[in-house]
């Protein structure tokens, strides 16, 4: 309802807004109701009573009766009628329009007419439409009922029809007809209940509708009743309050009269005494008094009234302070806290009439002053009401006092009362001033308290009157002047009375004050105890509101007076300004004193600000000065000077957090109060993504002054506060006409496009992370034309801006509108943190959060600390910037982080040299190319890794499998390949390969397995061919002595115990395996370095020849010889490294570092020095490889004897082949290491190259290979290990107690192993899975492996110094245990344990196991080696027991299965047996020798060490 008005009293109770009524009305009605409302806005008041009847009769203007629907409409309109304003006339009612605006009061008063109003109101919504709709609805409802009945009848009729049809159909005998009839009958039968239900539902719905209408009617009636009751109650309460007020007034009047009587009595008594004192003149005085009675009879009322007013006002003052104290818990001295006075207290003359005259005149003046505003002010109302009370009391007092008594007495009383009026004028005015809340005087006053106070006043007044009575006689005495003595006495008396009067006044005031205070406190306590807090709070709020209103009025009045004075007295404007200011100050001081406890400080401050600044426009009409000031404000707004802009928009973002925070002309978020260190939004401009600037540089306190716009002006767009921001895009304009405040005004912004985040490889669009909620202005300054490297087609620039607000307020992102920028000019590298890596190598770069900002073309002084990228020179090295971004000082201002989500494993870095040169700005088209390149590089690197690690792992497994294949060619090979593939997938998904892929993208096991299988097929074929070739070459080139020498060189590192070489003779099948291996690899030479691997084998053989003395070496030589060729095939890069290491034995080998000497010999995998006896080194990445060297350095004396048999041509070649297989495993690991190098990748120092699952020997600083890889590598062979009877569970790390085992124990274990080798070999044929080595084949565990394997291997009794390494530890057990320890690296080690005879070596091509043993020992290399030796001895003993069982198995699998394991496993297998042999032969001290890191790399044996470190988590790593 547009015109709905609410009476103040009833408006509060209205619960239904007019709009709802309108909404409820049916649409048909609603259309015309508005028209009707316009026509007849009001309903006659008499009609309000008829509302109820209207529901029943519902006669429309058309005369049609309204149905139940009419009732609902009536209900709908009923309440609007209540809400409707008072009906104008009945004539209006005669109109058909229904007026919903009947005033609530009249509606209730006139209930009879309400019914008619209701009808009308129903049709007011559009009576005709309502009637039509009602009729339509009724018509519809009737047809519905009819339809329902019809349906019911139709059901029967349909049944009859169906029967008829059935009867008809038989003659026709048409099946279709019967079917149709049946269908119709069924449909009818089914429809009939539905129709019934529908009709029932309709009937029920109608009933429910009627019930609802009734309920609504009853509800409305109940509302009316409740409203009426509430109104009646309120009226009763009001009446009660008024009655209470009246009673109070009457009581006060009675009180005053009583007091006056008492005063009169006292005065009479005093007069009698005075008469006695003035005997002679008493008669004359009486005459004069009789005359004076007529003169002063009019006056008597006023002085008496003054006294009465005083007494009354004292009570009032009591009451008011009580109310104030209850309301404001803190003001306890009512007399001292008067409300602000409208006028200064006027000194009261001795004549009471003057006081009465002056106060009314002043009141009139004040009223006149207030009258111009047209508002009766609250203070004036209070004062006027108080004055009315005083006037009433005055009238009553006059009536009581005008009765003349003894004239002189009356005159005396008059004079005394005048004195009272003089005494109490201030109290009177205080009383009036202290009644800001006249209403509550009645509520708050306590009659008993007031009686006591009045009694006290009477008691105190009596002495005053007694002495004052003397004073009234003085004028009479002056008139008589019969005797000067009398006059003198009177003068004395007068002076004494005056003095007494002063003292009494002071005392009286003090007493009254104390009594009032006591009464007030008691009364407050009573109120506090009895009153509810809600009431107190309500009163307090009310008083606060009144005080605010009064203070506003006072201020306005003062303003008005000041303005009037300025207008009327321009000469004195200055003086009057000073006066007005002083008045303002005084008024403020009064307000402070009065209201400080009441008004909250903030309010007071606002008041003061409003007073001395432009006063805010209030509901009160603005005074002249206010209008002037408002006019000034308007002019200021129109001008939009800087201050105004600052107010509206806050500071420009570039101004940062200047001290003039709130004066900044640009938008602020919440215009936060300045803080100790205000947060500066960090604005990062993105141009070319190369120059990074934080907002600190732009919004620095000093930067604002230094900001110089370079080629183009940046227009900071002020962001609207929070949600109000709307953006308009006007790309054609560099600066939008509107600053972004308009709705739909999008801001064209040149934002660099980030690489699409299509997949893990692609870079996500730069995320602008605003850390601080400060408004962030993303000012993308367009690079000058010179900056634009490529003037390509301008394309819309898009950036995804993520606002991360650390604070509750989301930062308003004020986006600067910039002309569309050529994206090509801006390199997307801003998102990447660098231009997309020029080469696929960059793809592997670890994800960097690059703080890249477009170069600020704003010239910033050099004072600023350049953030990374601030210099374009710096921009060139984007990667350096990325490194520096960590160094970027964190500013409180929000920073824009462009997060490149592609997370490449930092472990492998195939990218270019580390500060790469930034490529020229790439057009957007290049971005996709770079993304694709990056993807390809990642895929290639992934494939390479898969090839390297998996091939190293699987090939290492394949060789043992092939060895088995020699026994069980097809079955074992298939088994090995299958578990390897599954393991590869598992390993890649688990960790190694996953690193190469975006962290978010899971590795597809199918894809990985596919790549792995393909790569493996190729690489394995090549590697196997290379191994065969290399083994054959090694066999041909080196005599067994040469082999021994080769192994000595290889084992020079390993210090393989000589005794180990004695292989169990039954190893003959292994050579067959070797031949099989050789045949397969021969077909395809290793990509990496088959020749190098073969050369490595040869070198080892040469070294072996160089160190032929070590018999054991010859056995290791065999292993290494076999190892190198496949190793090269496995990982050509690693093979290069291994070749380099192998070449370390020969000075020719290039240093793996591709640079000068390694900082440490250990790190140098090729270091030749480590070959003989590398100094014991704590297990480092390098140690793993050097361990084999260490053991080689520790040749076991029994070994030379086997080495002698090794020279035997037949056995030697087989042995060489077997060792070559072992060495091939080593070299495979080495080749794996080199493989990356073969890829011609430059390995950064921080880069770790892993073949998948390959445990590379950890190169110490530079080439650290994660030992974790062993797990992945071992995972491929886990199944095979589980297939084996490995005592440790698959993946189980068996930490053997580092028991100090002596060489004797190791030798015994080796001997046991040797004895068991035959058995193990026999068992191998039976038990070994493709990837597994028979226990006889298993290499003796390294010391670390022994430790991991535990005492089982170590417990093996030494057979012979040479044998124990092969035979004592069941290579399977030892290596498996070591593998378990080393992450199942050695799981498949089936090399024969303990020394083997040359015959055995020849028979068992896998005599290579000696080397793996040696490597195992090497893995133990470091201070732990003695412990490792002990543990190894224990482990060998265990293995000896196991090997005794397994020894009979052919040794053929020795190293081959090791290779199935991760390269580290291979190295362990290769080095393991040799190492074990070495360990067996070498004292624990030798075993403790740490392998140099270089040797570790050089020998895949180091891989065994790595397997010890990483794979044998507990054994290798823990041992060290």
UniProtKB/Swiss-Prot annotation:
An example Gene Ontology biological process: smoothened signaling pathway
Phosphothreonine PTM positions: 1060, 1064, 1080
Compositionally biased spans, kind Pro residues: 1060-1069, 1195-1205
Positions with biased composition (Polar residues): 587-596, 605-616, 826-836, 1217-1230
Subunit organization: Interacts with CEP120. Interacts with CCP110, CEP290, CEP97, KIF24.
One GO CC term on file: ciliary basal body
Coiled-coil annotated spans: 487-519
Chief place of localization: cytoplasm
Pfam families assigned to the protein according to its UniProt record, in alphabetical order: TALPID3
Role noted for this protein: Required for ciliogenesis and sonic hedgehog/SHH signaling. Required for the centrosomal recruitment of RAB8A and for the targeting of centriole satellite proteins to centrosomes such as of PCM1. May play a role in early ciliogenesis in the disappearance of centriolar satellites that preceeds ciliary vesicle formation. Involved in regulation of cell intracellular organization. Involved in regulation of cell polarity. Required for asymmetrical localization of CEP120 to daughter centrioles.
Region Disordered, residue ranges: 322-370, 568-632, 759-793, 826-848, 1060-1093, 1145-1170, 1184-1230, 1500-1520
Keywords linked to the UniProt accession: Cell projection, Cilium biogenesis/degradation, Coiled coil, Cytoplasm, Cytoskeleton, Phosphoprotein
Tissue: Expressed in photoreceptor cells (at protein level).
Chain intervals with Basic and acidic residues compositional bias: 350-367
InterPro entries named in the record: TALPID3
Record region (Required for centrosomal localization): 485-572
Knockout consequences: Deficient mice die during organogenesis, lack cilia, and have randomized left-right patterning, pericardial edema and hemorrhages.
Compartments reported by the entry: Cytoplasm, Cytoskeleton, Microtubule organizing center, Centrosome; Photoreceptor inner segment; Cytoplasm, Cytoskeleton, Microtubule organizing center, Centrosome, Centriole; Cytoplasm, Cytoskeleton, Cilium basal body
Phosphoserine carried by residues: 426, 1068, 1083
Name the UniProt record assigns to this protein: Protein TALPID3
Assigned protein family: Belongs to the TALPID3 family.
């Amino acid at each position: 309802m547009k015109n709905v008005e609410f009476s103040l009293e009833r408006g509060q109770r209205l619960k239904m807004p007019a709009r709802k009524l309108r909404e409820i009305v049916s649409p048909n009605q609603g259309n015309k109701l508005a028209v009707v409302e316009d026509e007849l806005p009001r309903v006659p008041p008499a009609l309000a009573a008829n509302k109820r009847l209207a529901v029943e009769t519902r006669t429309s203007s058309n005369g049609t009766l309204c149905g139940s629907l009419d009732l609902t409409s009536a209900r709908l309109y009923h309440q609007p009628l209540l809400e409707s304003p008072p009906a104008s006339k009945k004539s209006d009612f005669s109109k058909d329009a229904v007026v919903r605006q009947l005033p609530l009061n009249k509606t209730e008063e006139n209930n009879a007419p309400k019914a008619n109003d209701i009808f009308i109101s129903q049709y007011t919504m559009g009576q005709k439409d309502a009637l039509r709709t009602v009729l339509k609805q009724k018509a519809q409802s009737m047809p519905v009922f009819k339809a329902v009945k019809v349906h019911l009848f139709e059901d029967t009729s349909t049944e009859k029809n169906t029967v008829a049809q059935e009867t008809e159909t038989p003659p026709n005998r048409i099946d279709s007809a019967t079917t149709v009839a049946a269908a119709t009958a069924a449909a009818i039968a089914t429809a009939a209940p539905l129709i019934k239900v529908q009709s029932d539902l309709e009937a029920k719905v109608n009933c429910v509708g009627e019930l609802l209408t009734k309920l609504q009617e009853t509800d409305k009636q109940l509302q009316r009743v409740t409203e009426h009751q509430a109104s009646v109650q309120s009226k009763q309460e009001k009446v009660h309050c008024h009655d209470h007020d009246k009673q109070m007034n009457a009581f006060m009047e009675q009180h005053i009269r009583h007091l006056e009587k008492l005063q009169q009595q006292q005065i009479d008594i005093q007069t009698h005494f005075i008469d006695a004192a003035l005997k002679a003149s008493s008669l004359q005085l009486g005459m004069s008094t009789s005359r004076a009675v007529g003169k002063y009879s009019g006056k008597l009322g006023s002085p008496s009234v003054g006294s009465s007013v005083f007494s009354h006002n004292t009570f009032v003052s009591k009451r008011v302070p009580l109310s104030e104290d209850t309301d404001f818990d803190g003001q306890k001295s009512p007399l001292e806290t008067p409300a602000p006075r409208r006028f200064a207290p006027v000194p009261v003359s001795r004549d009471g009439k003057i006081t009465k005259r002056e106060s009314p005149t002043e009141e009139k003046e004040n009223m006149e002053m207030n009258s111009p505003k047209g508002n009766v002010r609250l203070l004036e109302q209070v004062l006027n009401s108080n004055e009315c009370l005083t006037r009433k009391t005055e009238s009553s007092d006059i009536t009581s006092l005008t009765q003349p008594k003894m004239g002189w007495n009356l005159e005396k009383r008059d004079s005394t009362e005048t004195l009272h009026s003089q005494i109490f004028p201030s109290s009177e005015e205080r009383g009036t001033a202290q009644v800001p809340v006249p209403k509550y005087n009645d509520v708050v006053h306590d009659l008993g308290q007031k009686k006591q106070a009045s009694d006290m006043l009477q008691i105190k007044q009596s002495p005053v009157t007694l002495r004052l009575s003397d004073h009234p006689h003085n004028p009479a005495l002056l008139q008589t002047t019969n005797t000067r003595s009398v006059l003198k006495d009177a003068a004395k008396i007068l002076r004494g009375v005056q003095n007494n009067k002063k003292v009494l006044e002071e005392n009286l005031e003090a007493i009254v004050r104390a009594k009032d205070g006591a009464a007030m406190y008691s009364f407050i306590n009573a109120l506090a105890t009895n009153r509810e807090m809600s009431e107190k709070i309500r009163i307090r709020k009310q008083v606060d509101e009144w005080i605010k209103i009064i203070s506003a009025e006072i201020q306005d009045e003062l303003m008005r007076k000041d303005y009037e004075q300025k207008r009327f007295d321009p000469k004195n404007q200055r003086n009057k300004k000073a006066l007005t200011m002083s008045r303002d100050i005084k008024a403020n001081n009064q307000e402070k004193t009065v209201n400080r406890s009441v008004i909250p400080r903030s309010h007071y401050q606002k008041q003061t600000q409003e007073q001395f600044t432009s006063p805010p426009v209030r509901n009160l009409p603005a005074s002249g000065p206010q209008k002037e000031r408002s006019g000034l404000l308007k002019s200021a707004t129109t001008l939009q000077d800087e201050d105004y802009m600052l107010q509206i928009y806050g500071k420009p973002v570039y101004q940062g957090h200047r001290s003039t925070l709130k004066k900044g002309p640009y938008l602020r978020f919440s215009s936060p109060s300045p803080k100790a260190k205000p947060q500066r939004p960090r604005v990062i401009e993105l141009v070319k993504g190369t120059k990074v600037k934080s907002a600190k540089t732009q919004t620095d306190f000093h930067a604002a002054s230094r900001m110089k716009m370079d080629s183009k002006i940046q227009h900071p767009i002020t962001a609207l506060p929070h949600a109000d921001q709307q953006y308009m895009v006007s790309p054609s304009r560099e600066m939008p006409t509107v600053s972004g405040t308009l709705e739909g005004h999008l801001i064209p912004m040149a934002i660099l496009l980030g690489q699409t985040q299509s997949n893990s490889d692609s870079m996500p669009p730069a995320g602008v992370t605003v850390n601080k909620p400060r408004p962030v202005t993303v000012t993308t300054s367009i690079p000058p034309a010179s900056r634009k490297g490529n003037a390509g087609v301008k394309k819309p620039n898009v950036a995804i801006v993520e606002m991360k607000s650390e604070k509750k307020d989301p930062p308003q992102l004020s986006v600067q509108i910039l002309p569309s920028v050529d994206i090509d000019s801006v390199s997307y590298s801003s998102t990447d943190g660098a231009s997309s890596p020029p080469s696929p190598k960059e793809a592997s770069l670890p994800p960097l959060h690059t703080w890249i900002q477009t170069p600020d073309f704003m010239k910033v002084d050099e004072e600023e600390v350049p953030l990374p990228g601030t210099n374009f020179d710096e921009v060139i090295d984007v990667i350096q910037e990325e490194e520096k971004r960590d160094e970027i000082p964190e500013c409180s201002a929000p920073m824009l982080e462009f997060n490149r989500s592609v997370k490449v494993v930092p472990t492998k870095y195939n990218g270019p040299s580390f500060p790469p040169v930034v490529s020229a700005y790439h057009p957007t088209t290049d971005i996709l190319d770079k993304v694709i390149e990056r993807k390809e590089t990642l895929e290639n690197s992934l494939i390479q890794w898969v090839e390297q690690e998996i091939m190293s792992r699987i090939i290492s497994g394949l060789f043992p499998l092939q060895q088995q294949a020699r026994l069980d060619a097809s079955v074992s090979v298939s088994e090995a390949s299958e578990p390897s593939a599954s393991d590869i997938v598992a390993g890649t998904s688990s960790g190694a390969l996953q690193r190469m892929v975006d962290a978010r993208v899971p590795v597809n096991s199918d894809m990985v397995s596919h790549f792995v299988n393909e790569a493996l097929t190729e690489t394995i074929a090549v590697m196997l061919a290379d191994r065969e070739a290399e083994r054959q070459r090694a066999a041909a080139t080196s005599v067994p002595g040469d082999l021994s020498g080769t192994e000595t060189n290889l084992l020079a590192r390993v210090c393989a115990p000589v005794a180990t070489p004695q292989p169990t003779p039954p190893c003959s099948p292994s050579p067959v395996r070797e031949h099989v291996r050789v045949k397969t690899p021969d077909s395809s030479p290793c990509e990496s370095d088959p020749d190098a691997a073969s050369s490595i084998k040869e070198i080892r053989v040469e070294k072996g020849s160089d160190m032929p003395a070590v018999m054991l070496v010859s056995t290791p030589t065999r292993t290494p010889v076999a190892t190198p060729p496949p190793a090269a095939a496995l990982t050509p890069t690693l093979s290069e490294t291994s070749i380099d290491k192998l070449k370390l034995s020969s000075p020719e080998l290039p240093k793996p570092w591709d640079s000068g000497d390694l900082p440490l010999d250990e790190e140098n995998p090729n270091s030749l020095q480590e070959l003989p006896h590398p100094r014991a080194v704590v297990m480092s990445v390098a140690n793993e490889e050097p361990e084999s060297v260490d053991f080689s350095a520790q040749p076991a004396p029994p070994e030379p004897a086997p080495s002698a048999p090794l020279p035997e041509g037949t056995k030697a070649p087989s042995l060489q082949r077997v060792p070559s297989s072992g060495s091939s495993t080593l070299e495979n690991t080495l080749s794996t290491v080199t493989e990356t190098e073969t890829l011609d990748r430059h390995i950064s120092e921080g880069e770790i190259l892993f073949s998948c699952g390959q445990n590379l020997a950890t190169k110490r600083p530079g080439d650290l290979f994660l030992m974790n890889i062993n797990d992945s590598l071992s995972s491929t062979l886990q199944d095979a290990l589980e297939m084996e009877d490995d005592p440790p569970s698959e993946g189980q790390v068996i930490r053997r107690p580092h028991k100090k085992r002596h060489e004797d124990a190791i030798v015994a274990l080796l001997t046991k192993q040797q004895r068991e080798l035959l058995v193990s070999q026999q068992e191998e044929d039976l038990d070994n899975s493709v990837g597994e080595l028979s226990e006889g084949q298993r290499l003796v565990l390294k010391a670390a492996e022994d430790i991991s394997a535990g005492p089982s291997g170590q417990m093996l009794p030494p057979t012979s110094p040479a044998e124990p390494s092969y035979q004592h530890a069941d290579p399977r057990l030892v290596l498996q245990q070591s593998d378990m320890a080393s992450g199942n690296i050695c799981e498949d080690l089936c090399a024969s344990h303990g020394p083997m005879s040359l015959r055995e070596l020849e028979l068992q091509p896998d005599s290579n196991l000696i080397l793996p043993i040696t490597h195992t020992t090497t893995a133990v290399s470091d201070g732990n080696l003695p412990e490792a030796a002990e543990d190894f001895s224990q482990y060998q003993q265990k293995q000896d027991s196991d090997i005794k069982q397994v020894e009979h198995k052919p040794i053929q699998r020795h190293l081959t299965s090791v290779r199935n394991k991760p390269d580290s496993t291979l190295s362990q297998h290769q080095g393991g047996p040799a190492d074990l042999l070495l360990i067996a032969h070498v004292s624990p001290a030798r075993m403790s020798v740490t392998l140099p890191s270089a040797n570790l790399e050089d020998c895949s044996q180091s891989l065994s060490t790595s397997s010890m470190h990483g794979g044998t988590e507990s054994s290798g790593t823990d041992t060290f």
